[in-house]
C-alpha cells in the first residue's frame, strides 16, 4: 500500500511561504512590487526549492495566484542565491529572467516558455560564466525580437509588430556549458553556428530540428555522451556522423510515427553499426521506426524458456554483439518490442504493462504526443485486464496530467485512465495522500480544460471517491466546478446526470454551514434552472429527479436555502412538475421531502398558506406513491402548518378541520413497520411538535414517525432519540390531557423500545 507519511517540514514551510509571500519572505513596495525583507538571507538549497515549487504551484494548482514580481525576490545574490531552477510554460517572461540576471546559475531549464523573446538571449549571457546545464526546450520565440517598421501593418493588432529572427547570437563565452537542450526550436535557427563556440558538450538534444548536414556534431566526438535527435529526418549521412561519436552512452533517434512520413528505415546494418562503433552505449531509443524483418529472428527460432536479457540470447540479431545488456531500450510503437528476448533492463514499448509504464515515464516531460498514446494503452490494461503496478501507474498519470494540463489528448486519456485506476478494486492499495493528489489533478483538469470528454471523465473519476468525506478538503472548489458544468445551456446529458448526482451526494451528509455556503454559490438556483429546462422539454429523467433530491438535501435544516427555493419560483415548479408528471413516484417523494424542509421554517410557512397549496398537500395524503413516503411527507408539511394554530390558518378552503380529519385517516392507514427511504440526521424538527396541545394531529404524526423509525431501525434511531432528549418529551405526552389516547399509547411503545435497546446494549465489561 502507498505510504501516508506526512509532508516534510521543509515542504510545509515552503508551501506556506509561497502562499503568503508578503507576510513571510517579503513586503509589498508601492502595493505592487515584492521586495525581500532586509534581514533575510537564504542559501541556494532553499532559494532553488522556493522557485521550483512556485513554478509547480502555478502550473499544477489552479487555486494558486502567481505574483507578477515574484522573481524580484531573488534579484540580489548577496541575500538570495539561486543555482538550479526549472521554469516552464507561459509563467516565465523576459522580465523574470532579467530580475535574476545577477545570480550565478549552474542549471537553468526553460521548458515551453513561449513568452520568452530575444531579450532573454541577452539575459542568458549574464549566466555564461557559471552555466553548466541549459534547456531551451519548446521556447519557440526566444530567437525572435519584435520590430515595428512602418511597412509592417496588421489591422487586427492595436500595436502592429513584426517578429524578426535573431541570427547573430551564439554561445560564445559559455565556457562551462556541458548539457544543452534545444528541442522543438524553429527549423531555421542556425544550429551549427550557434553551437560552434561550445568546446566540450557532453549532452545535446536537438529534438524536432531538421538539419541535412550533421557533420558539425563530430567536433564533440571526444566529449559527447548523450545525443537526442527525436523526430529528426535521418539519412545515411546522419548515421555515418553518429557512429563517429564513440563516447556516446545515450543515443535517441526515435520518432513519432504519426507526425509525418520519414523515408529513413532502420536496418540490421545500422543497428550493427551502433553496436560495433558505440562501445559505451548504455541507452538506445529507436521508438517509432519501421524495422525491416531481417533484424530479428522468427518466433519459431526464439529460445524457449524464461525471458532473458543476455545479449547472446537476443531475439534482435544485431544486439547479440552487445558486451552487456542496455540499461534502457526504447521500442515504443516498434515491432521489436514484442519479441521475447530483449537485451535491456528497461524497455519502453506497447507489449505489456511494464513496457507501457516505462514509455510514460520516459516521454512525459517532452513528448506529450507519445505519452498520450502510452496512457491510452494503460487505460486499456486497467479496463480489460488488471494493473499490477498500480501505484506507479497512478503517479505517472498524475505527473503527465500536471505537466500537460492544456494538452487535450493527455487530459482525455489521462482522466479516462484515472477512472479505472481509482475504482473500488484498487482502493485498498491507495493512501489518503495519493487519492488526494488524484482529486486535485482531476479538479485541475476540469478547471483548465473545458472540453466535454475531459469533463465527463473527471466527473466519473470523482464518483470513485467517498462523497463527501474524501472531497471535503476541496469542498468549495468541487461545488463551484460542478455548478459551472451544470449550466443549462450545455447539451451533454451524460455530464449533467453525473454532475447532478455528485452535487446531490456532496450536500447529503454535510453540516449546515457547508450547505449554506453552497447555497450562496448558486446551488439552489442552478437546480431550479435544470428543473425548469426539463419541464419545458416535458422530460422527467434522472437529471430532473436528482435535481429535486439535491434540493431536498440542501434545504435540510437550512432556512436560507429554503427561502431561496421559494424566492426563485420553486413552488410553481413543484406544481408544474406534479401536473406534468403525475405518475412519477420518486419525483413526488423528492419534492415533498423538500417541502417538508421548507415547512419546518416558521418564518416561511405563511408562504405555503394558500388554498392551492393546502389542497395539493391534502390530496397527496391519499397518495400510495413510493409506499408511504409521499403521503408521510405531505402529512409532515401539514403538521408543521397546523402547529402554528387556528389563527394562522389563513384560507377558507379547505377548512382546517377537514384537513385534520384527512391527516388522521392517512396516519392510521400507514403500516408501522414500513421500511423507509429517508435519513434523519436530527429529530429536532419532529421533537418540537411533541410538547404542545394546539394541534393533536401534528403531535400524533411526530409520535408515529418516531415509533416507526425506532421500530424498524433501532440501532440508528434509538441512540439519536435518547441523545436529543426525546424520552422526557414522550413521557410528558402520556400525562397530557390534550393528547389523543392512541398518541399516548404510541409514545409508551417508543419509550419501551428505546429502554429495551439501552439495556441490551449496556456495556457490562469492567
From Swiss-Prot:
Q: Where are the LRR repeats?
A: 226-245, 246-268, 278-302
Q: Which residues carry this modification: N-acetylalanine?
A: 2
GO BP:
positive regulation of proteasomal ubiquitin-dependent protein catabolic process; protein quality control for misfolded or incompletely synthesized proteins
The UniProt entry annotates ARM repeats at 427-467, 511-556, 558-600, 602-643, 714-756
Gene3D superfamilies reported in the protein's UniProt record: Leucine-rich Repeat Variant (1.25.10.10), Ribonuclease Inhibitor (3.80.10.10)
Record's GO cellular component, any one? Cul2-RING ubiquitin ligase complex
A Pfam family name for this chain?
ZER1-like_2nd
| Record keywords | Acetylation, Leucine-rich repeat, Repeat, Ubl conjugation pathway
Q: Which domain of life is it from?
A: Eukaryota
Q: Which purpose does this protein serve, as stated in its record?
A: Serves as substrate adapter subunit in the E3 ubiquitin ligase complex ZYG11B-CUL2-Elongin BC. Acts redudantly with ZYG11B to target substrates bearing N-terminal glycine degrons for proteasomal degradation. Involved in the clearance of proteolytic fragments generated by caspase cleavage during apoptosis since N-terminal glycine degrons are strongly enriched at caspase cleavage sites. Also important in the quality control of protein N-myristoylation in which N-terminal glycine degrons are conditionally exposed after a failure of N-myristoylation.
* Binding partners and assembly: Interacts with the ELOC-ELOB/Elongin BC complex. Part of an E3 ubiquitin ligase complex including ZER1, CUL2 and Elongin BC.
Q: Which family does it belong to?
A: Belongs to the zyg-11 family.
Q: What is this protein called?
A: Protein zer-1 homolog
Taxonomic source organism: Pongo abelii
Amino acid at each position: 500500500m502507498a505510504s501516508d507519511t506526512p509532508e516534510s517540514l521543509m515542504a510545509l514551510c515552503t508551501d506556506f511561504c509561497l502562499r503568503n509571500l508578503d507576510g513571510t519572505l517579503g513586503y509589498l513596495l508601492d502595493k505592487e512590487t515584492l521586495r525581500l525583507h532586509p534581514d533575510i538571507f537564504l542559501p541556494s538549497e532553499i532559494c532553488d526549492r522556493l522557485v521550483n515549487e512556485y513554478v509547480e504551484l502555478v502550473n499544477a494548482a489552479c487555486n494558486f495566484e502567481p505574483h507578477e514580481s515574484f522573481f524580484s525576490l531573488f534579484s540580489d545574490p548577496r541575500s538570495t542565491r539561486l543555482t538550479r531552477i526549472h521554469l516552464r510554460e507561459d509563467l516565465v517572461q523576459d522580465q523574470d529572467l532579467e530580475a535574476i540576471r545577477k545570480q550565478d546559475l549552474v542549471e537553468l531549464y526553460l521548458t515551453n516558455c513561449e513568452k520568452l523573446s530575444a531579450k532573454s538571449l541577452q539575459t542568458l549571457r549574464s549566466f555564461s560564466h557559471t552555466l553548466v546545464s541549459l534547456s531551451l526546450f519548446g521556447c519557440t520565440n526566444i530567437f525572435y525580437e519584435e520590430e515595428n517598421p512602418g511597412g509592417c501593418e496588421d489591422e487586427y493588432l492595436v500595436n502592429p509588430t513584426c517578429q524578426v529572427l535573431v541570427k547573430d547570437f551564439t554561445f560564445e563565452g559559455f565556457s562551462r556549458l556541458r548539457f544543452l537542450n534545444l528541442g522543438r526550436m524553429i527549423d531555421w535557427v542556425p544550429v551549427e553556428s550557434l553551437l560552434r563556440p561550445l568546446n566540450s558538450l557532453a549532452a545535446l538534444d536537438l529534438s524536432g530540428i531538421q538539419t541535412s548536414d550533421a557533420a558539425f556534431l563530430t567536433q564533440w566526438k571526444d566529449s559527447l555522451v548523450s545525443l537526442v535527435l527525436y523526430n529528426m529526418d535521418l539519412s545515411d549521412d546522419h548515421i555515418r556522423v553518429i557512429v563517429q561519436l564513440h563516447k556516446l552512452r545515450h543515443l535517441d533517434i526515435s520518432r513519432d510515427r504519426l507526425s509525418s512520413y520519414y523515408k529513413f528505415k532502420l536496418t540490421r546494418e545500422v543497428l550493427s553499426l551502433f553496436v560495433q562503433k558505440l562501445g559505451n552505449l548504455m541507452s538506445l531509443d529507436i521508438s517509432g521506426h519501421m524495422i525491416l524483418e531481417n533484424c530479428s529472428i522468427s518466433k519459431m527460432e526464439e529460445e524457449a524458456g524464461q525471458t532473458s536479457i543476455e545479449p547472446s540470447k537476443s531475439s534482435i540479431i544485431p544486439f547479440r554483439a552487445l558486451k552487456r545488456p542496455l540499461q534502457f531500450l526504447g521500442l515504443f510503437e516498434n515491432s521489436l518490442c514484442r519479441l521475447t528476448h530483449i537485451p535491456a533492463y528497461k524497455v519502453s514499448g506497447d507489449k505489456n504493462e511494464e513496457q507501457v509504464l516505462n514509455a510514460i515515464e520516459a516521454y512525459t516531460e517532452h513528448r506529450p504526443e507519445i505519452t498520450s498514446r502510452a496512457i491510452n494503452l494503460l487505460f486499456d490494461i486497467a479496463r480489460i485486464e488488471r494493473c499490477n503496478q498500480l501505484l506507479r501507474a497512478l503517479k505517472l498519470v498524475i505527473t503527465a496530467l500536471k505537466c500537460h494540463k492544456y494538452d487535450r489528448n493527455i487530459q482525455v486519456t489521462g482522466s479516462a485512465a484515472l477512472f479505472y485506476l481509482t475504482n473500488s478494486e484498487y482502493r485498498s492499495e491507495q493512501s489518503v495522500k495519493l487519492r488526494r493528489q488524484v482529486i486535485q489533478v482531476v479538479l485541475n483538469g476540469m478547471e483548465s480544460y473545458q472540453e466535454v470528454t475531459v469533463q465527463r471523465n473527471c466527473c466519473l473519476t470523482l464518483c470513485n471517491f467517498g462523497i463527501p468525506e474524501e472531497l471535503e478538503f476541496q469542498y468549495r472548489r468541487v461545488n463551484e466546478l460542478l455548478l459551472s458544468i451544470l449550466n443549462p445551456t450545455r447539451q451533454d446529458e451524460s455530464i449533467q446526470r453525473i454532475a447532478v448526482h455528485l452535487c446531490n451526494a456532496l450536500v447529503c451528509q454535510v453540516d449546515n454551514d457547508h450547505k449554506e455556503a453552497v447555497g450562496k454559490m448558486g446551488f439552489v438556483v442552478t437546480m431550479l434552472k435544470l428543473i425548469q429546462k426539463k419541464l419545458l422539454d416535458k422530460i422527467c429523467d434522472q437529471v430532473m429527479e436528482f435535481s429535486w433530491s439535491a434540493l431536498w438535501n440542501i434545504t435540510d435544516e437550512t432556512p436560507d436555502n429554503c427561502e431561496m427555493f421559494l424566492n426563485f419560483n420553486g413552488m410553481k415548479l413543484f406544481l408544474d412538475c406534479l401536473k406534468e408528471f403525475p405518475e412519477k413516484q420518486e419525483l413526488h417523494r423528492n419534492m415533498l421531502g423538500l417541502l417538508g424542509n421548507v415547512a419546518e421554517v416558521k418564518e416561511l410557512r405563511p408562504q405555503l398558506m394558500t388554498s392551492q397549496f393546502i389542497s395539493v398537500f391534502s390530496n397527496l395524503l391519499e397518495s400510495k406513491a413510493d409506499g408511504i413516503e409521499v403521503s408521510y411527507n405531505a402529512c409532515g408539511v401539514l403538521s408543521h402548518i397546523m402547529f402554528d394554530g387556528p389563527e394562522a390558518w389563513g384560507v377558507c378552503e379547505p377548512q382546517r378541520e377537514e384537513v385534520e380529519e384527512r391527516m388522521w385517516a392517512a396516519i392510521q392507514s400507514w403500516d408501522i413497520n414500513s421500511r423507509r427511504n429517508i435519513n434523519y440526521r436530527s429529530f429536532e424538527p419532529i421533537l418540537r411538535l411533541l410538547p404542545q396541545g394546539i394541534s393533536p394531529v401534528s403531535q400524533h404524526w411526530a409520535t408515529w414517525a418516531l415509533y416507526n423509525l425506532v421500530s424498524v431501525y433501532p440501532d440508528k434511531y434509538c441512540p439519536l432519540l435518547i441523545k436529543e432528549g426525546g424520552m422526557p418529551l414522550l413521557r410528558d405526552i402520556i400525562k397530557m390531557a390534550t393528547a389523543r389516547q392512541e398518541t399516548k399509547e404510541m409514545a409508551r411503545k417508543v419509550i419501551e423500545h428505546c429502554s429495551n435497546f439501552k439495556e441490551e446494549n449496556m456495556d457490562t465489561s469492567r
